[in-house]
Amino acid sequence: MDSTGTGAGGKGKKGAAGRKVGGPRKKSVSRSVKAGLQFPVGRIGRYLKKGRYAQXVGTGAPVYLAAVLEYLAAEVLELAGNAARDNKKTRIIPRHVLLAIRNDEELGKLLGGVTIAHGGVLPNINPVLLPKKTAEKASSGGSKEAKSPKKAAKSPKKA
């Protein structure tokens, strides 16, 4: 073999990744782009390895996990956006995220034990505490002499 690196086989000197030295470098494509995802597949793979969840991590595991996380994030954001629009707001705040999660049956079950900071609570009034509708009001059909709720609630006591 001479100093140029060409030996008996007649092959030229190899550079990184098996390409010929001096040739055009191929543009790298991330695994997120290959999978059609927005979430970072490489970073999730690094976290899986670093976290020591298992001895070895398969090549498909970070892709699958990134896809699942992206789907969940999109679902929560869509519902939170709807909650913001219902409240005539253009910016999603933690309150909207909480309303979105707690009003959705499956997300509420998944994130049941999660506390969202500055989310507040769901509006809920026990039906027992609501004012009772009287039979007189229902039969009158909306007469002009409608009693106020305080007067309707107070009825003469019978001994």
From Swiss-Prot:
Which segments of the protein form a coiled coil according to its record? none
Entry GO MF terms: DNA binding; protein heterodimerization activity; structural constituent of chromatin
| One Pfam family named in its UniProt record | Histone_H2A_C
Residue spans of biased composition, Basic residues class: 11-29, 149-159
Q: What are the protein's UniProt keywords? A: Chromosome, DNA-binding, Nucleosome core, Nucleus
Q: Where in the cell is it found?
A: Nucleus; Chromosome
The record comments on the domains as follows: Contains 2 SPKK motifs which may interact with the minor groove of A/T-rich DNA sites. Phosphorylation of this motif may regulate DNA binding. This motif is reiterated in both termini of histone H1 and in the N-terminus of sea urchin histones H2B, but its presence in the C-terminus seems to be unique to plant H2A.
Q: How does it assemble?
A: The nucleosome is a histone octamer containing two molecules each of H2A, H2B, H3 and H4 assembled in one H3-H4 heterotetramer and two H2A-H2B heterodimers. The octamer wraps approximately 147 bp of DNA.
Q: Describe its function.
A: Core component of nucleosome. Nucleosomes wrap and compact DNA into chromatin, limiting DNA accessibility to the cellular machineries which require DNA as a template. Histones thereby play a central role in transcription regulation, DNA repair, DNA replication and chromosomal stability. DNA accessibility is regulated via a complex set of post-translational modifications of histones, also called histone code, and nucleosome remodeling.
Q: Can you say what this protein is called? A: Histone H2A
Originating species: Zea mays
